[in-house]
Amino acid sequence: MTDYGEEQRNELEALESIYPDSFTVLSENPPSFTITVTSEAGENDETVQTTLKFTYSEKYPDEAPLYEIFSQENLEDNDVSDILKLLALQAEENLGMVMIFTLVTAVQEKLNEIVDQIKTRREEEKKQKEKEAEEAEKKLFHGTPVTIENFLSWKAKFDAELLEIKKKRMKEEEQAGKNKLSGKQLFETDHNLDTSDIQFLEDAGNNVEVDESLFQEMDDLELEDGEDDPDYNPVAPGSDSSD
């Protein structure tokens, strides 16, 4: 006949010698104790830890001991669930033998796996952030590719804004007491207005948005130059060349 009490006392003595710094007796009847299990150090010396509480059943080891997660550090809920499932499996497989050392060893290995998973997850997150930063920098450097369509669209917008600036400038001059120009005078001074576009832009401050990236690549935009045409005649037919 099995002497369960003797087997339990012998195992308790062995456990106390194996885990001198992490073994704590909670009660003697029924025998109940805790063992703190810590993983190996991971990145930045980070560890995960759990304290297991065991209570011998009357017919242990022919019956599984009672067990629970007494406390834990740095473990997710799913990690705790996995550890409890592992303990149940190991207890079932080792019925009839003293098993606390086997259960604790299995949990120790599981904690080491969790630390490795944390390290892998953080490395993947770091790589993902670096990839996103690289793509953002590349997009910022290259900008929007220039096409004839978006250049002409920008040019139309630029010309419209420039015209508004000219009108505003003329209105301000009129309000300042200057004589309003006639149609002929406006025509004659149009050249001066064109050559003073830069001054208008400076006065406008940030009112005109210029996308510099549109000027980076203009290979696809062909501008006609009459002087490159071999049949080009600067003197139109029928004009008086003596003028």
UniProtKB/Swiss-Prot annotation:
Q: What segments bear the compositional bias annotation Acidic residues?
A: 209-231
Region of interest called Disordered, as start-end residue ranges on this chain? 208-243
Q: Enumerate the UniProt keywords alphabetically.
A: Acetylation, Phosphoprotein
Tagged with keyword Magnesium: no
Q: Which residues form the RWD domain?
A: 10-114
Q: Which residues carry this modification: Phosphothreonine?
A: T144
Q: Which domain of life is it from?
A: Eukaryota
- Interaction with DRG2: annotated segments: 142-197
Q: What does this protein do?
A: Protects DRG2 from proteolytic degradation.
Instruction: Cite the record's note on assembly.
Output: Interacts with DRG2. Interacts with androgen receptor.
Spell out the family assignment given in the record's similarity comment.
Answer: Belongs to the RWDD1/GIR2 family.
PANTHER family the record matches: RWD DOMAIN-CONTAINING PROTEIN
Protein's name in the database: RWD domain-containing protein 1
Which gene underlies this protein?
Rwdd1
